[in-house]
Amino acid sequence: YNVLEQAAIIPPNLNRIKRARRIFEDIRELEDAYNLSPTGEFPQSVYDYEQHIWKLQEEENNHALLAHMYVRHFGELHGGQMIKKKIPGNGLMYEFDGDTKELIEKFRELLDDSMAEEAKKCFDFASQLFDELSKEMENETVDI
């Protein structure tokens, strides 16, 4: 989220869509609550996604970056409300300031059909990440 939010040009009236700071706060909260200390590398798909986002920024393809923001951030807005009820911690990443209907409407004004292919790529990267995490979980036992 941090890389995406740095790369995309977000209109000032939509800055409240940003999640990176809240995600960081959620991670810190869970680290403290469960005495966790993250170790190891991220799955390869995280690095692949990051490279893809920076490539779009280098190409000045803000339209494509906004497609990724729509998929990721509005997934948190919609499905995240259910997830928040089921996870430990405050789940700040799922909280959006202000009128969410207005936020959705204003962001959708930036979208068009030409962004569909890039939105699909965003889903593909997410699927790749979930596959990698599933394989890792098969090989590890985590005590919380």
What do these predicted ranges mean?
Residues 1-144:
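Metal- and O2-centered redox machinery and metal/ROS homeostasis
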